[in-house]
């Protein structure tokens, strides 16, 4: 996943 955005997963 991304560090700042959870929806990047």
Swiss-Prot record:
Tagged with keyword Heme: no
PTM field: Contains 2 disulfide bonds that can be either 'C1-C3, C2-C4' or 'C1-C4, C2-C3', since these disulfide connectivities have been observed for conotoxins with cysteine framework V (for examples, see AC P0DQQ7 and AC P81755).
Key words, A-Z: Amidation, Disulfide bond, Ion channel impairing toxin, Secreted, Toxin
Any Gene Ontology CC annotation: extracellular region
Record carries keyword Protein biosynthesis: no
An annotated Gene Ontology molecular function: ion channel regulator activity
Tissue expression: Expressed by the venom duct.
Major site of localization recorded for this protein: secreted
Function: Probable toxin that inhibits ion channels.
Comment text on domains: The cysteine framework is V (CC-CC).
Protein name: Conotoxin Am1099
Phylogenetic classification of the source organism: Eukaryota, Metazoa, Spiralia, Lophotrochozoa, Mollusca
